[in-house]
């Protein structure tokens, strides 16, 4: 079987040194402390990949001079597959753009991880596997399996373009979907873009590397922003649209993921019932929970205890 790796981008936002560097670049920011609170999602993310995706050869965690708590991960799985990758490694040749606090800049250089397999799956640390997964969930017949749906590109919707620009002016985080739409435009899709769901994203290293070889100026522009900017595309989405353009993909035959987008609105009882239904549904293998740190401690404890049981059974 062809080798497949996992890549996760992560930062310990509670680290005072990191916060100091961040503040030096940005200055005052609303809700700063809340933004950087975390609930050790990286432990659950990494552990779930190693447990439920045994075909994964290596798990690369890309971070800024930090390391997650490997002892916590060892409570659930062996850590011999894990490699910690510093930003300095992937920014070799682009050191002038460091430090960066911009996930869209970091993501653009993931293909430069030394020893990375040709095919890899890109995860955020709030994405989890909750049931056994096989390589064919991600790559089938040598093609990436893409999970999402088609939507109209932003260049065909003037009001959305304006709203995205206003967000940038007000320093509100630029639209995630607009960044995917821009990626589609770059790849030659003017009317529709393939909108990704929040689960792992299959990537092909040679496709990304080959594109930047012929478009070095585009890469340097992408790296030039310290923080997310309306003028940036979403890198993994660019890879997806290049795969689609070359008919080198498969659309996921059915949705195997669930998103809990606003967990702050979930009462403990509601979350319990949701997790019970997740266990019953054999088709659902992937879970995304956004902003776990914004909900109640009781709700967080319910989620973690449920996940701990899955990892230890």
Language model region names:
Residues 3, 230, 234-313:
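Long, low-complexity C-terminal extensions of enzymes
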Residues 13-37:
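A solvent-exposed, charged loop/short amphipathic helix patch at secondary-structure junctions
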Residues 48-56:
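Short, acidic, metal-binding catalytic loop of nucleotide-sugar glycosyltransferases
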Residues 37, 69-116:
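Active-site-proximal specificity loops/subdomain of glycosyltransferases
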Residues 67, 109-150:
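GT-A fold catalytic core of metal-dependent nucleotide-sugar glycosyltransferases
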Residues 57-66:
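Short beta-strand/loop segment that forms part of the nucleotide-sugar
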Residues 145-226, 230:
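Long, charge-rich alpha-helical interaction segments
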Residues 14-18, 67-72, 92-93, 128-132, ...:
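Short catalytic/ligand-binding loop motif for oxyanion handling, primarily in non-cytosolic enzymes
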């Amino acid at each position: 079987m062809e080798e497949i790796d996992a890549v996760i981008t992560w930062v310990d936002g509670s680290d005072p040194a990191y916060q100091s560097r961040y503040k030096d670049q940005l200055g005052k920011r609303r809700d700063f402390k809340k933004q950087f609170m975390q609930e050790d999602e990286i432990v659950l993310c990494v552990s779930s990949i190693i447990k439920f995706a045994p075909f994964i050869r290596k798990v690369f965690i890309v971070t800024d001079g930090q390391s997650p708590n490997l002892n916590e991960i060892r409570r659930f799985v062996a850590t011999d597959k894990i490699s910690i990758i510093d930003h300095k490694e992937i920014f070799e040749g682009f050191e002038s753009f460091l430090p960066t606090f911009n996930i869209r800049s970091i993501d653009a250089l993931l293909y430069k991880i030394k020893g990375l397999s040709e095919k890899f799956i890109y995860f955020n640390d709030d994405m989890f596997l909750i049931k056994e997964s096989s390589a064919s969930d991600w790559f089938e017949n040598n093609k990436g399996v893409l999970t999402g749906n088609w939507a109209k590109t932003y260049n065909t919707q003037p009001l959305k373009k304006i709203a995205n620009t206003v967000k940038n002016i007000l320093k509100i985080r630029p639209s995630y979907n607009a960044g995917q739409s821009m990626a589609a435009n770059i790849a030659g899709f003017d009317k529709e873009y393939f909108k990704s769901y929040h689960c792992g994203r299959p990537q092909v290293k040679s496709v990304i590397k080959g594109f930047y070889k012929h478009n070095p100026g585009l890469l340097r522009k992408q790296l030039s922003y310290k923080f997310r900017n309306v003028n940036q595309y979403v890198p993994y989405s660019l890879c997806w649209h290049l795969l689609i353009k070359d008919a080198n993909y498969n659309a996921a035959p059915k949705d195997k993921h669930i998103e809990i987008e606003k967990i702050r609105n979930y009462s403990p009882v509601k979350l319990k019932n949701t997790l019970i239904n997740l266990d019953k549904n054999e088709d659902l293998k992937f879970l995304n929970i956004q902003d776990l740190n914004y909900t109640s401690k009781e709700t967080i404890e319910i989620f973690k205890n449920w996940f701990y049981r899955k990892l230890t059974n």
